[in-house]
């Protein structure tokens, strides 16, 4: 992970203010009076640009969206994480009932669409406290703007990759259960959220501790509005749903700990709050006056929905918890920000709406344990288990959660339904395929787009775990059930490579969260397409595909070009070989295409051969005029979805030389029990090489291993997490060699083991190694101690020397190789357009082979003589009116 990406709100303007030259933002010195900020209290001071905000100027702009003379929208500019100002057309996005909004006109929320990125949607809350924003976009992390000073208008822009991993995660006490039988029997043949936008009446209560944290009733309502802006942003995009805070909400915002109806947090989060909230809402609000109720606490570290899918359901007695029994309360005493809003509030309300847990580290028998380990979507348990994909949830619902919530709400009568006027898009997951074992593949989807929306695409495996839990919940090649592939946030591409193509390039076909299978399995995948629409217009659509893994075929893999320091010359003849392993018998796999990448496997735009037999061998001519230091080969069937990439990068037009050097860090290193990292560094002398591979040796001891976080930072500031809160309550030592090709950690093993890091080390590849490398370690939770006994980093790099170009006369026909074992290439420059004919005769003049080809400026075709006996043959090449005869020897 990169160090926090820190930009400052440089400018915020509106079309109504273009005549003014004064910006509402003023540059201030970073260190000025920031000691009182909550951020600094967290022990993580900011670095970067800081600005003070003229709230009155911004307020006058946004006020144009309200009042008797209100406009439908205005255009504002805010910075994105590239540091560029991005324009958004914004509209009102109130989280309040109309009466409550009239009562608090200065607490507002807005929604906006980017004018330059159709997938980007802005959600913005504004009040006397200041502005807070969230931008959801595909292919990039979510972006936030937050106030970071209590007494000053100082703001920062960051993204979700910058969220601090020491924020304590959610512990959800909601007991998962299958929805009631009437809902189970409902069919879900519809694959979208339909054409109805739903609105629910939300009652939010808060403890006196929550109100005191923000400074009073009004300030608590500001904070609730900020949280709901983020939560409603997710619900709008994924569920076509909006929660409106009821008009008499202030009666539920308690200020006196002695008078509020809730137990202290230490007992409340253990279950007392569910019934206490339900009773309070029944008494103060009345069951007929809200659809869903939730309590915000300020400490205790827990969440509990009370029941699953019981939105709209009234309690049947004073001891019954129904629609008004959910609560969220953080462990770190900070009931605000992305962790609280998404990991806590969106998760627990997701339960109330009808979604079960999606993790598979435990199997709850609900049919939706479809994420490996902890899971990473909203209804997972990111950062909580011994098998964490990541520290916190990504801000979207998995397909199974969307489906559960949609099915549940379809059975309810309390939502206010509004017809979505736009024609919905239609997802297409493509055909079903049969693929070989242990072979990468790519899912290819598409979607109609009748409204020209900024569509985003999310492929997810949809196989629930039935027996694979605990240590077996991770992905591994012989896993018999459950997920092999984690969920990733939506992208602009309708295709997904499995595993990630960067992992395939790094030869990492098996990792804890993405693994190919070595056994026969039937895998189910769902494509969810989001239109990222504004309030009342957002829709999703899904489609499924089935991938059958045939264990009698495969693996399909390239066996050539797999040695270090390999280089090619332009126009040279090269042999490419691959293991067929019966894959030619699979549907659509009798023929293959062979492609070339010159950018390390990011793309394969160059076809070396098309529609050639899947027979395991092909001679090719290296294209003229192409050079590259990081080239790879890809072979794919012409009508199937599996593929192979050769295992080593090679050069075209360069000779290469690789070397490896090990650099030890000074040890021992005391692991600090603070939010601050302890660091040690090594220095790599200046050179022009590129990183080929990085491995790390690490030996550390700790009384509670899961408290430990260890990272490696390269000279460019790129951060890779090596160890991140793993191995639970293990007490002792771990001796680890981190290699991307390593396996999962065996937590109780105290002898050396080669393991894959928490994040892949290949992220350092191709970067220059020169400069300072930093090892960072900390224990953010007090109570246990530890030490790094030894640590070293091995950096392998590669140098390149250009190959002098030698002129080649292609006016004459060249035949390579000669002698040959059977296959040879005919190469020449054809200036005609009348076709090329190649004829093979034996010594007696008998015609053996005759083939016709289309002309090409650089003609190169492979002729197969495998079936012929050893001997001398004559090759006749007819290019229009020109005829050339060559002799070739087969041995």
Please place each PLM-identified region on the residue numbering:
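C-terminal outer-membrane/trafficking sorting elements
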Residues: 1-11, 15-19, 806-816, 820-891
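N-terminal prosegments of processed precursors
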Residues: 20-148, 272-273
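Fold-level signature of zinc-dependent metallopeptidase catalytic domains
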Residues: 21-24, 29, 33-36, 156-309
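Acidic, Ser/Thr
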Residues: 444-451, 462, 579-584, 828-831
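The catalytic-center signature of Zn2+-dependent metalloproteases
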Residues: 246-272, 317-395, 460, 465-470
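Exoplasmic/lumenal beta-rich domain surfaces
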Residues: 244, 456-519, 593, 598-618, ...
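Loop and turn regions of beta-sandwich accessory domains that flank beta-strands and are enriched
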Residues: 613, 624-629, 640-806, 819
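Proline/serine/threonine-rich low-complexity linkers at boundaries of modular beta-sandwich domains
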Residues: 409-426, 547-556
């Amino acid at each position: 992970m990169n160090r926090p990406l820190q930009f400052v709100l440089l400018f915020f303007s509106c079309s109504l203010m273009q005549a003014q030259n004064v910006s509402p933002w003023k540059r201030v010195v970073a260190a000025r009076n920031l000691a009182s900020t909550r951020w600094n209290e967290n022990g993580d001071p900011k670095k970067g640009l800081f600005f003070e905000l003229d709230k009155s100027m911004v307020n006058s702009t946004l006020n144009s969206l309200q009042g008797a003379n209100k406009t439908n929208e205005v255009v504002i500019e805010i910075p994105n994480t590239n540091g560029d100002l991005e324009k958004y057309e914004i509209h009102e996005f109130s989280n309040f009932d109309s009466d409550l909004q009239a009562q608090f006109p200065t607490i507002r929320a807005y929604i906006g669409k980017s004018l330059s990125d159709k997938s980007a949607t802005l959600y913005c809350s504004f009040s006397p406290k200041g502005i807070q924003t969230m931008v959801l976009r595909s292919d990039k992390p979510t972006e936030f703007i937050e106030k970071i000073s209590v007494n000053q208008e100082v703001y920062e822009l960051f993204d979700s990759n910058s969220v601090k991993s020491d924020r304590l995660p959610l512990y959800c006490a909601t007991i998962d259960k299958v929805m009631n039988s009437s809902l189970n029997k409902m069919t879900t043949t519809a694959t979208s959220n339909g054409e109805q936008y739903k609105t629910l009446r939300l009652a939010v209560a808060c403890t006196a501790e929550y109100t005191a944290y923000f400074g009073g009733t009004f300030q608590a309502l500001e904070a609730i509005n900020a949280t709901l802006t983020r939560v409603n942003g997710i619900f709008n995009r994924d569920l076509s749903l909006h929660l409106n805070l009821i008009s008499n909400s202030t009666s539920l915002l308690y200020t006196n700990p002695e008078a509020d109806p809730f137990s202290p947090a230490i007992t409340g989060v253990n279950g007392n709050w569910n019934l206490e909230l339900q009773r309070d809402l029944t008494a103060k609000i009345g069951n007929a006056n809200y659809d869903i109720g939730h309590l915000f606490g300020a400490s205790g570290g827990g969440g509990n929905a009370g029941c699953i899918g019981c939105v709209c359901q009234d309690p049947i007695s004073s001891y019954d918890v129904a629609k008004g029994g959910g609560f969220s309360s953080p462990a770190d005493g900070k009931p605000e920000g992305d962790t609280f809003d998404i990991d806590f509030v969106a998760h627990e309300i997701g339960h109330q709406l009808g979604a079960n847990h999606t993790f598979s580290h435990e199997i709850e028998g609900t049919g939706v344990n479809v994420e490996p380990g902890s899971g990473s979507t909203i209804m997972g348990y990111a950062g909580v288990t011994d098998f964490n994909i990541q520290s916190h949830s990504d801000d979207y619902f998995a397909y199974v959660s969307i489906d559960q919530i949609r099915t549940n709400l379809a059975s309810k009568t309390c939502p206010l339904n509004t017809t979505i006027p736009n024609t919905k898009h239609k997802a297409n997951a493509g055909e079903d395929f049969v693929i070989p074992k242990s072979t990468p593949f790519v899912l290819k989807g598409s979607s109609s787009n009748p409204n020209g929306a900024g569509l985003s695409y999310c492929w997810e495996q949809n196989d629930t775990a039935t027996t694979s839990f605990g240590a077996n919940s991770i992905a591994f090649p012989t896993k018999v059930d459950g997920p092999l592939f984690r969920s990733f946030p939506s992208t602009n591409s309708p295709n997904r490579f499995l595993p990630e193509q960067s992992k395939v390039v790094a030869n990492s076909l098996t990792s804890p969260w993405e693994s190919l299978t070595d056994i026969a399995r039937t895998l189910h995948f769902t494509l969810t397409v989001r239109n990222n629409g504004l309030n009342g217009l957002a829709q999703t659509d899904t489609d499924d595909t089935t991938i059958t893994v045939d264990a009698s075929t495969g693996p399909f893999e390239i066996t050539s070009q797999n040695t270090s320091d390999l280089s090619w010359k332009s126009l040279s003849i090269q042999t490419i070989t691959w293991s067929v392993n019966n894959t030619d018998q699979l549907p659509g796999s009798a023929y293959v295409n062979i492609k070339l990448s010159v950018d390390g496997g990011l793309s394969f735009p160059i076809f070396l051969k098309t529609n050639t037999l899947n027979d395991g061998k092909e001679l090719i001519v290296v294209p003229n005029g192409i050079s590259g230091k990081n080239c790879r080969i890809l072979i794919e069937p012409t009508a199937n979805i599996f593929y192979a990439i050769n295992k080593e990068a090679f050069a075209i037009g360069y000779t290469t030389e690789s070397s490896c050097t090990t650099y030890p860090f000074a040890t021992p290193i005391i692991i600090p029990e603070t939010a601050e990292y302890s660091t040690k560094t090594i220095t790599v002398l200046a050179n022009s090489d590129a990183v080929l591979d990085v491995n790390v040796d690490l030996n550390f001891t700790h009384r509670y291993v899961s408290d430990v976080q260890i990272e490696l930072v390269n000279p460019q500031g790129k951060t890779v997490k090596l160890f991140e809160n793993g191995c639970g309550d293990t007490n002792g030592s771990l001796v680890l060699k981190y290699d991307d090709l390593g396996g999962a950690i065996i937590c109780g093993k105290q002898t050396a083991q080669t393991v894959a890091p928490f994040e892949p080390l290949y992220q350092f590849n191709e970067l220059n190694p020169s400069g300072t490398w930093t090892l960072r370690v900390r224990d953010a939770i007090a109570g246990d101690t530890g030490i790094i006994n030894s640590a070293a980093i091995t950096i392998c790099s590669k140098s390149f020397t250009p190959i002098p170009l030698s002129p080649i006369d292609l006016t004459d026909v060249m035949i390579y190789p000669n002698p040959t074992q059977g296959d040879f290439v005919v190469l020449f420059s054809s200036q005609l357009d009348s076709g090329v004919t190649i004829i093979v005769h034996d010594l007696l003049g008998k015609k053996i082979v005759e083939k016709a080809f289309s002309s090409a400026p650089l003609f190169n075709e492979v002729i197969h003589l495998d079936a012929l006996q050893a001997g001398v043959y004559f090759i006749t090449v007819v290019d229009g009116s020109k005829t050339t005869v060559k002799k070739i020897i087969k041995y």
